């Protein structure tokens, strides 16, 4: 009798596990919709009680409570696009997932709780973003207008290695007098001082391109093959390269990125299919669970510090920055892309005396933001969002095409650094200064023996 009862319990647990697994799978569009609704509701609660409740003083952060009708519209706008997500089938799906979680949901929410009587502006912005969100997920599925772009003759991998070494030597030769190693966990004040000092140094002018190309293109590319071939000495040398970059820019992301890439590679390699179908659930449920912990343990100093980094500066940052940009450019002139140096060099039409991020924050901070804000709202309002949305859509199609012969495991690592830039900088800065354009050229022009068809 006891054995039969235990067997029944195991069967019930097995069935429940199957049901939960099915709901959390990206193949279930209804599960995606429900998870997006839950995530959006938790996001709203944390934005109201943590971001707005505790940090409203950092800028023009609004929270106008939504009516029932507006809440329903907000939930539909937030959740319907995610029903089109079907897992990481192409690299554009990887871009679109992070863009959805850390740009789209905060953007829609921030517009819905904005202190504004201009409903036409609010709903037109939201509708355009809604259409683009659906298109971005669509292009990551089966729809492929351009297939397999490959430049011939192909450049051998050895040539990329030599170029990487040469660029590293040039970087060290230029920046060696400004290199310092600082513990990112215990010596934060010195880290910020050195970061500011190096950023203002005239002798380091122009080195940003070199650093961005190494960080976002060359180092990830060689790291993938070294991990694939288990060339551990060369893996360590690549880590050393990242540390050299960190010793100049003093950015925590630069120091942590190689470790993130290696861990990500190993996780995806263990079960590529499961990661492809469930990575969205892992990320969203982790944020939901952490938000619950913050709610219960918000008086704990350690929890509060982590929450400030994870929620204020990562999950919700696009939300309050959206409100900063919308408020600012409702009252001030658009840049018409003159915030991009090369365009301003030709037009000499940039309307502000300080960089865009500082202008928007009225000099109180450097409010760098995602490309929908910098290259959209700041550049031309609704028209700017339409232009940059179409540009990004075209870019996703191109990236899908050049990466079609690569394994997903490799693509996760290759494009992770540039995805991290997409979330807080101009799309043109990401392409030119942070390595996306060189990476795209390398992927299209190089034939490495771990290239294979995507599954």
Region locations from a protein language model:
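Membrane-anchoring hydrophobic segments
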Residues: 10-218, 222-223, 229, 272-275, ...
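Internal alpha-helical transmembrane segments
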Residues: 228-259, 263-299
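Short hydrophobic/aromatic segments of transmembrane alpha-helices and their interfaces
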Residues: 30, 163, 235-239, 366-368, ...
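Alpha-helical transmembrane segments of integral membrane proteins
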Residues: 158-162, 233-236, 382
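Residue-level signal for alpha-helical transmembrane segments in multi-pass membrane proteins
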Residues: 80, 167-174, 222-225, 241-248, ...
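Helix-loop-helix junctions and helix-breaking kinks within/between transmembrane helices
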Residues: 108-123, 240-266, 377-384, 426-434
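Intrinsic-disorder-associated, low-complexity terminal segments enriched in Asp/Asn/His/Tyr and depleted
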Residues: 3-10
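Small-residue-enriched transmembrane helix-hairpin modules in multi-pass membrane proteins
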Residues: 17-30, 34, 38, 42-65, ...
């Amino acid at each position: 009798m006891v054995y039969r009862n235990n067997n029944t319990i195991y069967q019930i647990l097995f069935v429940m596990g199957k049901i939960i697994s099915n709901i959390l799978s990206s193949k279930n569009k209804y599960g995606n919709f429900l998870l997006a609704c839950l995530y959006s509701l938790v996001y709203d609660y944390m934005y109201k009680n943590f971001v707005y409740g505790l940090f409203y003083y950092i800028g023009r952060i609004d929270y106008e409570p939504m009516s029932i009708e507006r809440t329903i519209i907000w939930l539909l706008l937030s959740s319907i696009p995610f029903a089109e997500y079907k897992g990481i089938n192409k690299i554009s799906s990887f871009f679109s997932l992070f863009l959805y979680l850390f740009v789209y949901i905060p953007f829609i929410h921030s517009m819905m709780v904005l202190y504004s009587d201009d409903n036409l502006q609010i709903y037109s912005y939201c509708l355009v973003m809604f259409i683009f969100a659906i298109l971005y997920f669509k292009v990551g599925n089966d729809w492929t207008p351009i297939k397999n772009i490959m430049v011939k003759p192909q450049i051998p991998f050895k040539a990329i290695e030599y170029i990487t070494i040469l660029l590293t030597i040039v970087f060290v030769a230029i920046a060696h007098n400004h290199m310092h190693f600082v513990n990112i966990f215990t010596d934060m004040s010195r880290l910020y001082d050195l970061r500011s000092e190096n950023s203002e140094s005239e002798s380091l002018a122009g080195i940003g391109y070199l650093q961005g190309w190494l960080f976002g293109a060359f180092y990830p590319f060689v790291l993938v093959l070294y991990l694939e071939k288990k060339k551990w000495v060369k893996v360590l040398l690549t880590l050393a390269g990242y540390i050299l970059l960190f010793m100049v820019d003093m950015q925590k992301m630069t120091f942590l990125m190689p470790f993130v890439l290696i861990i990500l590679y190993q996780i995806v390699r263990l079960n590529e299919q499961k990661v492809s179908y469930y990575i969205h659930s892992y990320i969203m449920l982790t944020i939901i669970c952490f938000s619950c912990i913050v709610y219960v343990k918000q008086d704990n100093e350690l929890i509060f510090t982590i929450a400030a980094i994870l929620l204020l500066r990562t999950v919700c940052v696009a939300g309050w920055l959206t409100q900063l940009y919308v408020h600012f450019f409702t009252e001030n002139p658009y840049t018409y892309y003159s915030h991009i140096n090369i365009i301003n060099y030709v037009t000499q039409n940039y309307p502000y005396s300080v960089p865009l991020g500082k202008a928007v924050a009225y000099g109180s901070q450097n409010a760098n933001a995602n490309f929908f804000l910098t290259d959209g709202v700041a550049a031309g309002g609704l028209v700017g969002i339409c232009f940059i949305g179409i540009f990004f859509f075209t870019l996703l199609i191109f990236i899908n095409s050049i990466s079609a012969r690569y394994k997903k495991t490799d693509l996760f690592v290759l494009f992770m650094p540039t995805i991290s830039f997409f979330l807080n900088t101009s799309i043109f800065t990401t392409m030119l200064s942070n390595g996306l354009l060189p990476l795209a050229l390398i992927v299209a022009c190089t034939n490495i023996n771990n290239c294979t068809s995507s599954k």
